[in-house]
Amino acid sequence: MSTKSSPARGTVYIPGHAMTLRSVELKKIPIKVLKTVFENAQKISPVWSLEQASLNSLAATAETMLPGPILGPSRAEHFNGPDPTIPDKMVVRMVEGDHKMLFRATLDDTYHILVTRIRVREKFVQRLARAMYTRRASMLMDVELPFKDKMEGVYAAADLEAICKMHYWVFPHTVPAPNMKSPDDKAYLTSVAQFARSTKFIESYMYYMRPHDPEVNSTDTGNRVAAMLIYIHGMQCKLASLFDALDAAILRSKFNAGSRGHSLSGIYGFTRNGKGTMMAAKSSGNVVEQIRRTCPFGSDAMVECLISALDRMTYLVARWELMSVDKRDDAKAAIAAGMGLAWLLNGHLSYLTNMIMTVYVLWLPEHYLNPRLILTISSRVLLGQLLCTSHTTFRENATCPKMLLAQNAVEWKKQERGTAAWLDYVCARAWLRASRENRKPANITAMNNTLEEISAHVLKILEEAPQPAASAPSSLCATNYCPDSPPSRPPPPPPVQKRAKDPGRFSRIMAGDDRRASVQSREDGSGYMTCEHTASTSTKLRGRVLSAPLIRHRRKSAEGLQGAAKLRGGSLRLPDNGGRAALPSEPPPSSESTDTSPEARPETDHK
């Protein structure tokens, strides 16, 4: 696939198609977002899986890598009724019964093998985080911090990138706290621990809520995934607020020797106030309302845990808004704590996004082109770009270190071998059942669309979608707008058109028969103005300003029309309004009336 990016128009070039990404559903998708969607699209091939192994072999492989409740017989019983779904209580019972966290066993094994190979420790991870942030502060904010941790030559570039990606899985409970007083320090660490427990519950809930068959049309599963996407998008905005608060704390410190650098809110275009950032308030928005509206019933435990995690992260960001770093040790501790919390949240969101991109995209409407999914990926791509954007040029700095690194769906699927084995088994089983029934599996077939079919689908959406308003927000990370959700505010009422107070007097004014009413209308601004002018004055006619030469031109045109009517044997009654045609409210002129105005004398002499 060849892509050609154009920042001015946002056009992606696909063989045979040229798509301009301007619509309400797809909301100004950046080029990197579509590239991410196309690259991460998992092409499911049940035929290839059945050629490599039999169905029984695929089932045996999946059973050895998955927890017992995933392939148990109790899961399929809930999909035989009219409303195929797994009850919320059953999912919670599976989550609470997984004391050993078997849902993440394969990922833990993969990352611990990597840690053993490269021999990395927690202190080195904190040094790496400080080195990355110090370099970013020097390049983008023009702030030279009094400490430098050199990481060049310690590990290879690929190993350093792997360390950043695996931080969430290897060191999830070792997020430090910035230097604060004893009560505040204890409250901060307690909040971080509670947030970590909430993330584990959300991840395990998503792991166990999957249906047993990819061809089952489960509305509740689609609603739960939509609520997860809203949660991920809101947390991406919280992550932006966290970096904004950390940048602002560094810029307020004494280490900023006259630099005019901006925090992330300056790049967004917002300004700071005494209670935090405008972006933080913008990111909170109506995420909770959208989650409750998406899952009104049937998923109470998941919804409450999502809201609890959002509230806990909001509290942590609020603590960072009031952070002060005036000493060298305070700055080192603050950077290590801020980067640790950011990597904790980024790893959590990366797990949820990859699970949706790999498994739950089967039950999403439009699959990989679902507007909520594209909005979530857009927020992640946009945040990564903003963290490397200079406040002077407003361009992404290619040499700035990437602060947030995460696996894509292809890498994650290779590491999460249990989910990959389950996907191969259930898709092969659904394919064989559909072949016996002489039909095509709809969801599996939709996951294997060609590039031309996907681009044609996008073009169809763009043609059917109305044009977005000019005042629509262009930042996907600073707003909680969701394309396929109803508007949170009612549309404004249409403007009330003003009507004339006295139609009868208005007609007399236009005919020039009521001079006193004309003067009165000129004083109070109601009605239309008559054309009583001199050569050096101007008038208002129908809300427009007309100069004296234009009025003389219109009077000459009126004289010509009146003379032509008299040549035909009739007469034409013109109101004293500068030669303008009479409105429908005016009475029709009488054919028996005679014109005695001074303007008609030249035509009378001519006749």
Curated annotation (Swiss-Prot):
Coarse class of the protein's main subcellular location: virion
InterPro entries: Herpes_UL46
Membrane as UniProt keyword: yes
Short name of any one Pfam family annotated for the protein: Herpes_UL46
One BP annotation, GO: regulation of DNA-templated transcription
Biological function: Abundant tegument protein. Trans-activates the immediate early genes.
Protein name as it appears in the record: Alpha trans-inducing factor
Organism, scientific name: Psittacid herpesvirus 1 (isolate Amazon parrot/-/97-0001/1997)
Source organism phylogeny: Viruses, Duplodnaviria, Heunggongvirae, Peploviricota, Herviviricetes
Gene designation per UniProt: UL46
